[in-house]
């Protein structure tokens, strides 16, 4: 059977839901398409994405196909060190390419087609030059990745070099500060051929050792497995660094090595280079392999080795854990050539009791003096926004408490006490003060925007009454805040993107409504003038008359819940015709009921169904409760998963009760669905409740003993709480499952913990125990689905399943 032409579908007898009692165990079924009402919404041309220069003078419009083709997914692929790459072209095999580019001035609506683009363009890695007069990008041919550049003024593209780039470890180039040259990763001249050991006889056993150290790692996919994998990994990771001028001339800048990171200092005079080192690992991916970081001058001459990181196979337990040694090493945005980095003071172990968890250092070029300690954090370091010599913003956080603290500190005077700015629950969205606005400095790096001794905050503005985004000014000395602007829309959403001119009050915003595609505008917050920048049209006209509202309801323990309810176009709410209901959800963990009860649902959000959405079925006569809140709460010393199943069922019951109370549904005809952890949720709901007629579970994990060192937000391992893992595992409780389920999985799932084997074994258990189930394996797909053929067939499968479950 050729998997690129047919589907592998397994099903047991499911006569109980109206399907023939003589269902065959395996079908070879050609690809199908969903009904026209769904197809018209799924197969639409997308509006372009927008990239603007920093001055908001020029706009780059980037166009992509709505789907990949199965042929694109059928490319050569090599899986090494957690990477999936095409060994022929030397770029990630999962890239979602751009196929066309246009330029336009922000001040007018005239679009210029970029001329000279390659035929059948496969564009990615778009990067503006520092002076924003050029845009570099890569184009992938049938056997290589090429470097191209666009002249913005003329909208003309040209290929810069015939060299084959190495994009296996992300973007293969960066701009020099002069905007005339690029530092480019090129395949080595004498690169050896990759080894194909598929037909070789083994030369010995594969042996791994445990030295007694605790090493609790997640179930990573695509790891190295043998010596040949190691050789091939070194091969695909190795590059020469070339200096390429925009006139097309090129010279070798640094000999071949496994370069994994390159960045120029803000003044453009130094380069920080990181290389992967040996030994490699068979149990962790490339981001935990050893590495070495050096700083060089502009000729590539080494100045200083600034960091060496050993292989990190062993890590303390917990989401606030980290490794020992220097980490988060970056150039300071506010200095010409200074590095900053963080060191754990607790060995990276959250279980240790210490006064301070992390220490932040600054190290000035040429790195011949000792680094300077700037500040210590009581919790785990999160991030820094550099400002000027006397002001920077630092945030630390702690997962177990969900606490997050933000401070102002003086990077020039470590003795000066940091000032607490915010002390908050990171999950309390109603009290979120917003993000500090940044602006470009003299080095063209983004730093804290400071005007008249004020910093500025841009917030999403979620509240009990709705969503009203805002801009606040904060006095740096007193921390007193003044609201400069707050959106008043009740029929639209105005998301604030950036402050463009502090003196004039010009702000870039994006406005959308249920039926209006998100478009960019300039808003003047002083005179309230609004000027449109883009005019993208709604490609989902088939949904314009579908009823959409946010409903709020209460779980039996008092927790407030919400979801977005869609009803078919023309549905008469007064007649209360009983519709089948579809619920789509994804569980989320919380440490308190107040945070769990907060809602980010907004009825004014543009209705744009993804391939995975249930919203399509509003056109097929179903009521749809989308993104229904499914909080799992563990207060105090109780972990959320200690009561996972009861809360899951309570969430579902509350959702059904709420829609039923409106009079719209037949509660005997309700289906539930979810993807990934939502699929796990679905299987548990069908196992432990009788609320649903059927369910759809996509790309889930069903046996938690196969993820023994934690999953999702669970930090404890299986041996600490075997009863929790067992209770939460649908596979372990498959004998209780009697409700029809459609199981879908990508054949090549690359997500930790959701290997395709999870669905295959769960289906075998259900089939063996006589449960009604159907399994669909989508060829070539990973955790998210991409190929048009597979996605349209998925929609057909779901429609067939729901029609048989809920309408017959």
Task: Specify the residue positions occupied by each region the protein language model found.
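Bacterial N-terminal signal peptides that target proteins for export
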Residues: 1-9
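Beta-propeller folds
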Residues: 10-14, 18, 24-518, 522-529, ...
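Conserved hydrophobic/aromatic pocket- or pore-lining residues that grip, position, or stack substrates
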Residues: 293, 339, 421, 520, ...
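Secondary-structure transition/capping motifs at alpha-helix termini
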Residues: 296-301, 365-368, 398-401, 409-416, ...
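N-terminal cap/lid segment of alpha/beta-hydrolase-fold proteins
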Residues: 534-577
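Short beta-strand element of the alpha/beta-hydrolase
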Residues: 576-588
